[in-house]
A protein has these predicted regions:
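N-terminal secretory signal peptides
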Residues: 1-13, 24-33
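Bacterial lipoprotein signal-peptidase II cleavage site
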Residues: 34-46
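A structural signal for short loop-to-beta-strand junctions that line the ligand-binding cleft
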Residues: 64, 130-139, 154-158, 162-194, ...
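Early extracytoplasmic/lumenal segment of secretory-pathway proteins
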Residues: 64-141
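Ligand-binding pocket segment of bilobal, Venus flytrap-like solute-binding proteins
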Residues: 143, 222-226, 230, 234, ...
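Conserved C-terminal helix/tail region of periplasmic/extracytoplasmic solute-binding proteins
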Residues: 276, 381-411
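Extracytoplasmic/periplasmic substrate-recognition and gating elements
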Residues: 288, 297-350, 410-411
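Mature extracytoplasmic/periplasmic domains
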Residues: 322-385
Length: 411
């Protein structure tokens, strides 16, 4: 986006033109589906970059805190996961706005493609009680739970986060791995389903396509390296519930995945890399995350994201401050900054994932009512009824599931 957040969101944004053509367009809002209020609440008078949009306004960092923002903030995130200038991929309006408000330069790295892979890069330092080099990271709920369980994340000073406290949607509060909501902050939620090039495959609606040895896509199919997504979708194909998966279910799912590998249907297992491959044509069908495919429609209009007939997976990615981070206070300021409804709307309008922030829908609706009805940002009851959250695994179960999955992926 190119205009300041106090102005209306840019109606010419490429992302919007494609999200409005989504195969799921026309469903009602997520906040209605969850029975939560959609009005963001400011927790203090607006500061130097106030929002004039309905639904909430940013709040000042508490004046009692005798700290100053740091000169830099080291932020690790996934690709395609923050608003990006259409003409310059190195520019991100949200980060520029944060710099303008606090004077902090955000060193932003799209370095995360897989939770386990990234965990491996920070584990040695955290295990040794050292700074892992990141002030803020975004990881999926199961990995957030693991880091919290290990004691490897900082506890938030919620006094520095009035927006987060006021504007976090109720459905995200009190999760089992952080019942006090002071170790993690949801970044975005999304769904896992089918991503495909309709110009090659035609319309696909069933997970069976991933196991179909069709010459149009055999050998050009990718499964996700995220165990919960890959096993979860496979269980849905088999008519089983991923939210109640057993070790026996894992065995059955792994055997099913192995069939697709042995048949030569599967090209490989990937993180976000599949998105670029869909554009290039190296891949024409993939287990895919909703927002990734919609973003890439700007480069290739024939790409489609589909919630399968059998259902899909629902997940949340979360902001965490690793233990020993050099700039904890500034990381808290950033978390609170993106819980301003105007900033949350700015991000959601580009990434096309489900925003956890109250009031973001009203900001979008004031500027673009059609976008505010996007089922990928605000899923309907009908959509939510078809998606599952993978069960919370014990340490023993997680080890078992991961070992079985690694055997088939080769990782």
């Amino acid at each position: 986006m190119t205009d300041h957040t106090t102005r209306s969101l840019n109606p010419e944004l490429t992302r919007r033109r494609f999200i409005q053509g989504s195969t799921l367009a026309g469903f009602s809002a997520f906040l209605v589906a969850c029975g939560t209020s959609g009005t963001g609440t400011p927790s203090a008078p607006a500061s130097s970059a106030p929002s004039t949009e309905p639904g909430g306004s940013p709040s000042e960092a508490p004046s009692a805190v005798p700290q100053s923002p740091s000169a830099e903030l080291n932020f690790a995130n996934w690709p395609l996961y923050i608003d990006t200038d259409d003409d310059d991929e190195t520019k991100h309006k949200t980060l520029e706005d944060f710099t303008a408000k606090y004077g902090t330069v955000v060193k932003y790295s799209e370095i995360i493609n897989d939770n386990e892979e990234f965990f491996g890069t920070i584990r040695p330092a955290l295990d040794a009680g050292q700074d892992a080099g990141w002030d803020l990271v975004v990881l999926t709920d199961f990995m957030a739970a693991r880091l919290i369980r290990l004691g490897w994340v900082e506890t938030f000073d919620l006094a520095n986060m009035p927006n987060k406290t006021a504007n976090l949607q109720d459905v995200y509060k009190g999760v089992d791995f952080d019942p006090t909501d002071d170790h993690h902050a949801p970044w975005q939620s999304g769904m896992t389903g089918l991503g495909y090039d309709s110009a090659v495959t035609g319309n696909l609606t069933s997970l069976d396509a991933l196991w179909t040895n069709d010459p149009k896509w055999a050998g050009k199919v990718t499964f996700l390296t995220e165990m919960r997504d890959a096993i979860g979708l496979t269980l849905l194909k088999l008519g089983k519930d991923p939210s109640a998966a057993t070790q026996a279910d894992a065995d059955e799912a792994i055997a099913e995945i192995q069939k697709a590998v042995d048949a030569g249907i599967v090209r490989g297992f990937t993180g976000n890399e599949y998105a670029e491959d869909l554009v290039s044509g190296n891949v024409v069908l993939a287990m895919a995350w909703s927002g990734d495919v919609i973003v890439k429609q700007a480069e290739k209009e024939s790409l489609v994201w589909q919630l399968p007939d059998e259902g899909g997976m629902l997940w949340t990615d979360n902001m965490l401050i690793p233990k020993g981070a050099a700039h904890k206070y500034t990381a808290e300021l950033f978390i609170d900054f993106v819980y301003d409804p105007a900033i949350a709307a700015q991000i959601a309008a580009w990434v096309n994932y489900v925003t956890p922030v109250k009031g973001a829908k009203e900001v979008l609706a004031a500027d673009d009512p059609e976008l505010a009805e996007s089922p990928l940002i605000f899923p309907s009851d009908e959509v939510l009824a078809k998606v599952k959250i993978f069960k919370s695994l014990t340490e023993e179960e997680e080890s078992y599931f991961n070992d079985k999955f690694s055997a088939v992926t080769g990782n």
